[in-house]
Regions:
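Residue-level signature for tetratricopeptide repeat
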Residues: 23-27, 56-57
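Solenoid-like repeat scaffolds
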Residues: 8-15, 38-47, 74-78
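TPR repeat positional signature
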Residues: 21, 50-53
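Repeat-mediated protein-protein interaction surfaces in helical alpha-solenoids
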Residues: 1-13, 26-39, 88-90
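TPR/TPR-like alpha-solenoid helical repeat scaffolds
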Residues: 11-12, 18, 54-63, 80-96
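TPR/TPR-like (Sel1-like) alpha-helical repeat modules
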Residues: 45-47, 59-81
Length: 96
């Protein structure tokens, strides 16, 4: 899936079934369903999922937990990046 296709999918009421888990997590996060996004990334054990896990905790305001997950992903806490910028960056890393 390409970037614009993903963005267009956000106009739909349900998540496209073909999305892999990390993209599904970003989709649900964009739709305001933080808990669902969090549940999805908890089930995946890779660097991308850890980055998204960090992002959702940062969005929640749980910086301590977010820093833990950034560390697991080999990343640093993005002090100067907005949540919107980080979400977009994560998406671009996955779909180009």
């Amino acid at each position: 899936m390409r970037y614009q296709e993903f963005m267009d999918s956000l106009d739909q009421d349900s998540c496209p079934s073909a999305l892999e888990p990390c993209l599904r997590a970003l989709w649900f996060d964009a739709k305001g369903e933080w808990d669902t996004a969090h549940e999805i990334v908890q089930q995946v054990d890779d660097v991308t999922a850890a980055r998204i896990h960090a992002y959702v905790h940062r969005k929640e305001g749980d910086d301590w937990n977010a820093r833990y997950w950034y560390g697991r992903a080999g990343s640093v806490f993005p002090e100067k990046m907005s949540l919107k910028e980080e979400w977009n960056s994560l998406l671009l890393e996955m779909v180009g």
